[in-house]
């Protein structure tokens, strides 16, 4: 059974979006290497008027998606051991390590919130993991769900042409990726670094490692500190400051 992503949403028409194009889309539509399902939670309203939400307990602005509606939608599915994810700005940050963990499951079930969010009781009762794709607030969880789904399915066997490329990306070993270049050799008076044209693969690997360390230290000090701690725990020497090339 291919990796299956099921999305609980008020707006199933938002999908597949970018999931339907390029290699990800081909793997879904033509190769059946992964599957996408959407479930319209509006179909599970218990209100004669079709309402899915109610006012927040304790007062306040906005509306909250009702627990019984979400529970009914979820209970209509066969989970098959798939993790339950709720897209939320207050959730734990999305990381490549978590993506790799989820990608090993039969699939994922993703709940997209709206308004002020979802009644906390259904999240607790059903064991949802709250996931954030960044420190910003969106109108709903659909765009964030697509990010999580794409991150997972691109790791499914056969989806990408070269699986080794996923091992050299940002975050795979705690560091950000090195800069990339291609022809032409000179662009607006900027040249490709000479080491990349040297044919000396040892020097190229050393340069790329230095650039990864430099980029991580400058742009993500949190990742850099975690990387240093991990290296020290392994007994590896502390990386030095990357040299200019």
UniProtKB/Swiss-Prot annotation:
Basic and acidic residues composition-biased segments: 210-225, 235-245
Compartments (UniProt record): Cytoplasm
Biological process annotations from GO: tRNA N1-guanine methylation
Location, primary (coarse class): cytoplasm
EC number: 2.1.1.228
Keywords in alphabetical order: Cytoplasm, Methyltransferase, S-adenosyl-L-methionine, Transferase, tRNA processing
An example molecular function term from Gene Ontology annotations: tRNA (guanine(37)-N1)-methyltransferase activity
Transmembrane feature ranges: none
Cellular component GO terms held in the UniProt record: cytosol
EC primary class: transferase
Superkingdom of the organism of origin: Bacteria
The keyword S-adenosyl-L-methionine belongs to this UniProt entry's keyword annotation: yes
Catalysed reactions, semicolon-separated: guanosine(37) in tRNA + S-adenosyl-L-methionine = N(1)-methylguanosine(37) in tRNA + S-adenosyl-L-homocysteine + H(+)
Oligomer and partners: Homodimer.
NCBIfam families linked: PRK00026.1, trmD
Protein family per UniProt: Belongs to the RNA methyltransferase TrmD family.
Functional note: Specifically methylates guanosine-37 in various tRNAs.
PANTHER family found in the cross-reference section: TRNA (GUANINE-N(1)-)-METHYLTRANSFERASE (PTHR46417:SF1)
Protein name: tRNA (guanine-N(1)-)-methyltransferase
Native source species: Caulobacter vibrioides (strain ATCC 19089 / CIP 103742 / CB 15) (Caulobacter crescentus)
Taxonomic classification: Bacteria, Pseudomonadati, Pseudomonadota, Alphaproteobacteria, Caulobacterales
Gene: trmD
